[in-house]
Structure formats: C-alpha cells, structure tokens
Amino acid sequence: MKYTVSFEEIVWFDSSCQNDREMASYTQGCLILVGILVTLSLPYSHAFWGNENKIQTAVFLSPKFVLGPGSVENRFYYNVNFPKGHIAVRSFDAEVIDEAGNPIPLHETYLHHWVVVRYYVRKGVEISEFDDPRKFNESDYISGRNSGICQNLGQFFGLGSETRKTSTHVPNPYGIEVGNPTEIPSGFEEQWMLNVHAIDTRGAEDKLGCTECRCDLYNITVDEYGRPLRPDYRGGLLCCYDHTQCKVKHGFEAVRRTLYLRYTVKWVDMDRSVLPVKIYIFDITDGWKRSRCSTGIIAEHECKVEYDIESCDATGIGNDGCIDTRRISLDMPFGGYLIYGVAHQHSGGTGSALYREDGQLMCSSLPTYGEGEEPGNEAGYIVGMTTCYPKPGTVEISKGETLILESNYSRIRHHTGVMGLFYILVADELPKSMHALHTVVQTQDSIMVVTTLWAAVALIGVVAVIVVAAHYRLKREGEDGYEAIGM
C-alpha cells in the first residue's frame, strides 16, 4: 500500500497557506497537512515499518524412490537441497508426486511421515544422500536439533498424511531462524537430512492395516537390526521399516513406479525485523514424571512416539462416546509467547489440545478427513490438521509452568502405531510496534493481519486536505465575486 502525492500539490498547499492573508488562521493546519502529505507520499514500509523483507520461494525434489504394491520406503537422505544463508523460514510444505509431477493419492501411496532434521558436519567431510548415520564419526557430526522437549524428536519440520491441507505458515514478523553463522560450530557447516516414510497400498488386503504397520500383515517378528520384537508388539514403526512388504491380494499386479517428495520452502533473509521462534514438540507417550530434582530438560523425557488403541468391543464398552482420551502433565523448561501450534495424528484421531493446569484451553488441533478419491481429499484418511495462531501476546508460557497435553482417538476399531504429537512455535518477545500498528484478526487456520491505524490516518489526512482546499477555494471565489460587483 502506498499513498502518492505530487510535489506540485504540496507546494500549492504550502503557498496557499503562506500567500493569502485571509487564510492566516489556517496556516498551522496547513503546515500539519503538508506534513501528513509528505509522510503519506512515502511507502508505508519505509515510513513506519522499516525496509520490506521479500519472501523467497524454492521448490525441491527428494532423491527418487521406487515402490511396488505393498512395498515400503523409509530412507534417510543426507545433505538434501535447502535454501542457503542466514534466513528465517516462513513455511515448509511437501507432497508425494510421480515422475510427471502428478500428486499421488494416499490410497495408492500412503505418506506415513516426512521429517527434516538439521545437523552440522565438519568441513571437508563428505556425507552422501544415502549414508548410514551409525557409521558417522562422532567428531565429524553434530546434531542441530530443535529446542525440545523429546530426545528422539529433533526435527525442524515434518508431517504425515495431513501434509497437503495443513498450514505451516509462520506469521510475520516471525520466522524459524537457520543458517546463523554464530550458531554453527567452528570448522563445521550446516546441512539437512530428509526422512521419507511411504507405503504403497495398491492392491493391499487391508489398506488401513498396512498404513498402521500391523506386524502380521508384514510377517515381521524382528526389527530392522534383527532384534526380536516384544511379544505384545502388534504394530508400528518396528514392523514397516525400509524394504518390508505388506500383504497384497492374491494375483494383484501393478507396475513399480518412481516417486519423489516435492517440498516447497518459503523464507526471508534474516534481519532485525524478523523475530525468531523456537520449535518444541510434545508427545502424548512421554514418560516424564515430576520429582524433586526434575527440571523438564530434554534428557528427562522418554518419548515412545507411538501407541495402540484398543477397540470398544475388546473392553466391553459400547460405541456411544467410544473415545480413547490420554492426558499427560509436563513442566515447561522454557518460557515465551505461543505463536503457532498443530497436532499430528493418524487415522482414527479426533483431535488434540494443549491446556493450562487450570483447564484453560491454549491451543487445539482437529483432523480433517477426506471424502473423495482425489489427492488432498482421500476418503477415510486424515488429509489436514487445523492449526492455531493465537493473537500475539495473548498466550504466554511461563518457565516452570505445568501444561496438559491431550490426545483423542476413536475406539470403534483397534489401531496400532498411532501418534499423538503436538508441535508449537514459541517466541521470546513480541514486536514492539504490533499493538500500535495492527489489528490481528484470527481464523482457525490462518491469521489475517489488517493494517488499520495508518490507513485511517491516511484517509483522515486526505479528507482533511480536500475539505480545507475546497473551503479555501470557495471562500476565495466568493470574495472575488463580491469585489467584482462592488466595482
């Protein structure tokens, strides 16, 4: 938005104020109006907010992976493409596509999850896309994880089947800061790892069972390292690791196809106008317990990531209100302002929420289920999770405060390997000018920032200028007319 006034108009008003003795009483007002006009002739970004920080966009492809009916891809790709420099990420979106760039529906290739993790590698040490992290020399590799709180959930970005219809937008003036030279260890460089876990369910005997990684459908009794599974482990990540095979219908055939994860990153250059946010991930399976010596730090949190849901029939409970509700209490080892929140759930999920200890709702996230066949609307699958964007400054987390995480699932049928994660962004500070310059209008999935104060000033200024000019001209014309008659 830019209000432009010509130099001639400014001079005309200034000379009018100075040259007409009959307008002496208006001189002060005219000078004020001249000031308003000069101010309004500047772009608002320069007049009030500083230099505009342009949003940049890049689209990347993961290394290709090839899937046939029932097969599984769960690879870790190192040193993947990512924007360079000291930047603030504003969004990170992804989806599975084929070689022609066509989106692949979940009922053909189920995207269990994708995650992006930062790490630092010693300069001169080559890490290929397909390296095994267990072979890394510890002195050459340093984790660049998020701020907490689970030891094994260090990703910066990540979603699952809900990826196409879940907002990852970080509202202005915030951003996820990466590439900060002062944070990169001396002699190291920042790189990124991408993990893609996808399951081809074409022709599967039980599509949902394959996506929930039921061990009987994969005929798995040991994990990917050859260790025997627990007798009570019926399904989850330990049964659908890379190159496993889910059971397909007898005689079903389909071509193997090459796929990619296409990911789109939006960012701005990091400068003083951007306020960095920190990433925290909570897990409903977290085994943390309060004790005299507990501090809530990462080392104290044992997050199992997945759990099972027993059906109502198995527990003798009717279908009415047949919901599995789990709650845990967590003491916050940090403080700040909640900027964004979203949950991650699997099929059967009915929503998740974050509460204060007194029961006050801080943020909720609900699943959207598809109703059709096309990508982004696949019936029976979670195709999106609602997000929360609290009005800046309204939801503050105090260090040491106890929060309650809740995760809900339907128990109409048995589920294995479900998740109950909650991802939040927290800022240490608020923009100093936000309350004076903006009115924040919240919707469930996005925030529309409406610049009102200076627009109102601009409108008032323009109207005032027009009124004064019209009044002066009418008065002058009237006086000229009386003089002519008098002569």
Segment roles from a protein language model:
Residues 6, 12-14, 35, 39, ...:
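N-terminal non-cleavable signal-anchor helices
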Residues 1-34:
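Classical eukaryotic N-terminal signal peptides for Sec-dependent ER targeting/secretion
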Residues 12-18, 40, 60, 273:
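Compositionally biased, intrinsically disordered/low-complexity regions enriched for serine, proline
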Residues 27-44, 461-464:
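Cleavable N-terminal signal peptides of Sec/SRP-targeted secreted and luminal proteins
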Residues 477-487:
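Cytoplasmic C-terminal tails of single-pass
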Residues 453-469:
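Single-pass alpha-helical transmembrane segments
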Residues 46-451, 470-474:
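Beta-strand-centric surfaces of beta-sandwich/beta-rich domains
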